[in-house]
Amino acid sequence: MEEKKRYNLGVLIGGVHTYFPKEHIKGISEAAAELDVNVCFFLGTRTKDFFEDVLGSKQKNSYDYQFNTIHDYSLIGGLDGLIINYGTLGIQLREDDPNEFARKYNGITTVFLTEIVDVPNCHSLICDNKGGIAMVISHLVEEHHLSRILFVAGPEHNTDAIERKEAYLETMKKYGLPVTPGMIAQGDYSEFVDKQVERLLDSNPDAQAIVFANDEMAFAGYRVCEKRGLVVGKDIMITGFDDCERASGMEPPLTTVQQDGELMGKMAVYDLVNRLDGKDPGKEAVSRRVPVSFVKRESCGCVSEDASRKETPVGLGAQVHRLNKTIAGMKLELISFQRKSWFIPVLARDLNDCMDDEQAFLKEIMEKMRELHTR
């Protein structure tokens, strides 16, 4: 009897320091073990966004293309199937076109996560982003009678983020609530968007709620509000999206939208293996929406319906809150350390880039000196 071939699957994914990609990886790994297939991860990144966040300044040059050359190795790796989390990759393509990127891998059976592509032999899995945000806005308007609702968006070229922002605008319009450009801040899905939240609140002193495009950015909202003496869930309402592991342990617990990243990762592996086994021979592009659910907690002004929270021993909630603050503080300390330790090598890189132009070289030095607050 001929032994069944053990498939080799590749995974192109970035942003693995954030919650949702980690959930994808967990689901992919578990399904791969269950189905006895090999998995190779090709980890790309978005260095431009990272440098701007870590170094606290605008970066003129992007070196994403250097990091993302690893994606090309998946083409020569003898892979049977490929899972691509397009939204997390730092892709340097003309017009940032996912279909163009998909065609590059058209010879491999492929599943795209968090992106919809219309290319043969590619299936797409993406959550119901619009439905999730619509549920949040509707709840704030109908149950809490709020009208001044701000929004912190995710990366501008990320499909999940685009759909969530569109849903915010569409749902606010549905209720006849005006939205100005100053009511929307551009985030990056990281926890370190404190400055964006500060500016948003400065521009909107009458804000009643902030809807964040994911949970990690909402944590920054908690920090900023605490510094301003605003009590989340009373003075201002905050909501997120993802229902990550820290959401229920926040003080107050974070109202959010639950999407199952682990399930999405498993579904991608099941889909690939099913097609590789010949059980789904179709070559046409197929997209599926993964359902989400609204998780009502206390940060939106509701009283939690989580019975287990009512049974929480006295003092345990406070301990969890302190632990969350400690973790966030340690992350901020790490960011501060990275800013200091990376400044010199990045300075050397930028100066080297303009070495042939004396005026540009001197201008670069002056800009860096201003960043160091020296004259």
Predicted region positions:
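Bacterial carbohydrate/catabolite-sensing allosteric modules
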Residues: 1-357, 363, 367-372
